[in-house]
Curated annotation (Swiss-Prot):
Residues 103-118 have a biased composition (Polar residues). Residues 1-144 are annotated as: Disordered. The chain crosses the membrane at residues 158-180. The keyword Cell membrane does not apply. This is Putative uncharacterized protein DDB_G0286829. GO terms for cellular component: membrane. It is a single-pass membrane protein. It is found in: Membrane.
Amino acid sequence: MEKKRTLSVNSGNNELIPPQPPSSPKTKNSLNNIENNECNNNNNNNNNNNNNNSNSNNLNNSNNNNINTSSNSINSSNSINNSIDNIDNKDNHQQKYYLPPSKMNSSQEFQSYLTPNKNNNNRNNNNRNNNNNNNNNNNNEGTIQNFTSRMLNSIIMYMIRPFLVGASASFGISIGMFYFSPFPPSFLPSSPS
């Protein structure tokens, strides 16, 4: 004798399915279908949980990566600032041993050269700017000189030189014509006969 199996499965309307005797094959099939549906529901729930876990992992990984990259960029900027500070400190250390020229006699100016401060840095920056301005002026003078020399060369090559060549050629041709003509002028010697 088979025992009666009673299964209570929640349907869409939250209603309990009443127990049925397993005498007919239809009831057996329905019970098997109910068990299969339960298994499928469990599998679907597991899949959903896996998907949720994978999504959360993706979010965590992406957030962590973004945070790490931003922290790396911040660290790189800090290293740049530190290197600039080190350069400034080296400049200041060298300025401590720099003596002023002989024309500076006051104690304040002497002290300003011995102790690095903002005024000293400003003085160095002004010197750099003056050097840059001098270089720019020299470059401008060089370009002006090059321009004038090119203009003079072009004038000589394309205006004066052809005139000189043409004048000399015409003068030579005219002298030759007079020299070999049957009636030479009186100021030229007679042509050889």
